[in-house]
Amino acid sequence: METHRKNSVVGNILHTCHPCRRTIPYRIYAIFHTCGIIALMYHHVHSLVTANNTLITCLLLLSDIVLAFMWATTTSLRLNPVHRTECPEKYAAKPEDFPKLDVFICTADPYKEPPMMVVNTALSVMAYEYPSDKISVYVSDDGGSSLTFFALIEAAKFSKQWLPFCKKNNVQDRSPEVYFSSESHSRSDEAENLKMMYEDMKSRVEHVVESGKVETAFITCDQFRGVFDLWTDKFSRHDHPTIIQVLQNSETDMDNTRKYIMPNLIYVSREKSKVSPHHFKAGALNTLLRVSGVMTNSPIILTLDCDMYSNDPATLVRALCYLTDPEIKSGLGYVQFPQKFLGISKNDIYACENKRLFIINMVGFDGLMGPTHVGTGCFFNRRAFYGPPYMLILPEINELKPYRIADKSIKAQDVLSLAHNVAGCIYEYNTNWGSKIGFRYGSLVEDYYTGFMLHCEGWRSVFCNPKKAAFYGDSPKCLVDLVGQQIRWAVGLFEMSFSKYSPITYGIKSLDLLMGLGYCNSPFKPFWSIPLTVYGLLPQLALISGVSVFPKASDPWFWLYIILFFGAYAQDLSDFLLEGGTYRKWWNDQRMLMIKGLSSFFFGFIEFILKTLNLSTPKFNVTSKANDDDEQRKRYEQEIFDFGTSSSMFLPLTTVAIVNLLAFVWGLYGILFCGGELYLELMLVSFAVVNCLPIYGAMVLRKDDGKLSKRTCFLAGNLHVGSYCVKLLRPQVTSPLRLIHNNNTSGWFKRKKHNMNESV
């Protein structure tokens, strides 16, 4: 049933919501698939009772339990998916009635996150089609870099030309880099002059970054000349004082024609000390929450990664269609836009779109209590950070109350003094910050964890996915960078899974069953490494040994495996296609799940165990957004896998690839020339081999820098050969694979053994 929401003031329909057409078929299929899973569990239990060796059966049972659970978490998001539509053109309000907006942009490393990228993101939101005096942009520089500070000073000067140009000419691409690199940008004298100004600014910033320091000759603003003296020899990214600088003030700054008011632009680098925990990105966001609370305290907050520029100047008004709706705004915590990326290869070879996480699952969540928070592109209700909708948790000082009206100048001395105080590294001691107030601590995936806790407190959220992307970002172009990013996510997800606020316990208790199961999908996703490892090695070794671990083709249970496998993959493919994907992208996405399971998830689990045992400390490694390697970029555009430098991360993956290839050759030979019924094993091995084709090419055929290293291939080969040699050295011990039960031995293996005895 379609629902409409109206703005009670002007009576316009601002947004609609309607269920997806696939809901009923998915619900029917869920019943049949559930029955199939129950039958499979019965088969496993029966095999466990009758088997001579329980280890193999237990491993297969464990793997199928994980697969069944992950299917249940996905299915919970398929039972009530909805799509929404907004009407921003119908939003009507006087300029003075528009709510204020605070924008939080986070960066941490000027070399992995180039300052010009930060500049373009900041300029794109400063130029929103919105009253400029209502916008305040806060840039958190967690690396405390003078290079980033210099770039933002340059951005403030350029904005006085850029913002009037955008609004006067109704420019849609309000990131200067995107606008000037497009073929459709204006060729007028004004535009060409502005392009020259931008290129000059870009040249200065990149020169400073390349040299690693800000030379005095480049500092043209006397107002900020003394600020650079703060970067002394003792200043480091892990130990430095608070720096807060107002680079642009809406109360006093106007464009060069004196017609347009400029938005606020504030640089924030919080105090850091090696003896005080800083809680990574969550700590930086909480610092911005307090600093902005003291200075502007806008009721709406937009969080952005430094590479996620605004692609639509009307995005803010789209969010207001929900955030100002009197019927839902009191319980609405945030409006989440999907992450979308520019520069993705034609078939998204690394599955960087993350369509399942950012689109498919979000549509499912939206039919329950609302989407998860994904770390960027999210408009928050400031009140949501201060306790449940029904109970306001007061902060420690009155200046941080969410409903306070900030009526003092942001450059007032007492305001700046208090802002420096709340950005101190010991300010949060003995407060509710990170536990009951603000972004939550306890996981490296602070975004997902915070969204989960807000939902548990009773807040709802909305997924806004307009046809024109609201934001565009950058994605890894090298498999090493992607795997490194996923390891960090895996550790954070494990932290969430095993905490006292685990979605499977606290989530299901605090939320309804479907929402709780849906929230289990991502935190338990690293457990995919269990079935991927078991099914990547066990049936293959069985096939090489001529032993069956699956039902034969003549066994009725054979068809249960076929139906469950093809049914699950067909539903996954339909999800992808119905949300605008393609078959090739889906294929790459499911292949990347295998790669992540045997690399990121595998090593993420090891790192989590070491961290739990206090044998290592958590690390927040910034994913590089700098794409300076032309050869690497060329390989990505040609959709050639780039395994980068020699890395142990790919050792399990390479080992599995080698085992599957040998099993495929041996199994195919056995079936073609000796007969037999190991069809399920051979089907699984064939599926794995096709998925591993890029790995085989990187091992043998390629000579470029993106190939798999000889060391990794050598170690992987030795692992397989070593395991085989152990078997040969112990002929008197029956292989565990042959003890599954006697009548599981394949026909072709028996015939082969019989022929050998006759020849003797």
Curated annotation (Swiss-Prot):
Q: Name one GO cellular component term.
A: Golgi membrane
Q: Which residues form a coiled coil?
A: none
Q: What Gene3D superfamilies does this protein's entry cite?
A: Spore Coat Polysaccharide Biosynthesis Protein SpsA, Chain A
Report the transmembrane regions from the record: 28-48, 54-74, 530-550, 558-578, 593-613, 656-676, 680-700
Q: What is this protein called?
A: Cellulose synthase-like protein G1
Q: What does this protein do, in the record's words?
A: Thought to be a Golgi-localized beta-glycan synthase that polymerize the backbones of noncellulosic polysaccharides (hemicelluloses) of plant cell wall.
The similarity comment for this entry is: Belongs to the glycosyltransferase 2 family. Plant cellulose synthase-like G subfamily.
Q: Which GO terms describe its molecular function?
A: cellulose synthase (UDP-forming) activity
For this protein, the Enzyme Commission number is: 2.4.1.-
Question: Does the record's keyword annotation contain Chloroplast?
Answer: no
Keywords, comma-separated and alphabetical: Cell wall biogenesis/degradation, Glycosyltransferase, Golgi apparatus, Membrane, Transferase, Transmembrane, Transmembrane helix
Subcellular localization, as worded in the UniProt entry: Golgi apparatus membrane
Organ and tissue specificity: Expressed in young seedlings, primarily in the vascular tissue.
Q: Which Pfam families does the UniProt entry name for this protein?
A: Cellulose_synt
Name the domain of life this protein comes from: Eukaryota
Recorded source organism is Arabidopsis thaliana
Question: Which InterPro entries does the entry link to?
Answer: Cellulose_synth, Nucleotide-diphossugar_trans
Which biological process annotations from GO are given for this protein?
A: cell wall organization; cellulose biosynthetic process
Main site of residence? Answer: Golgi
Instruction: State if Transmembrane helix is listed as a keyword.
Output: yes
Catalytic residues (UniProt):
142, 447
Q: How does it sit in the membrane?
A: Multi-pass membrane protein
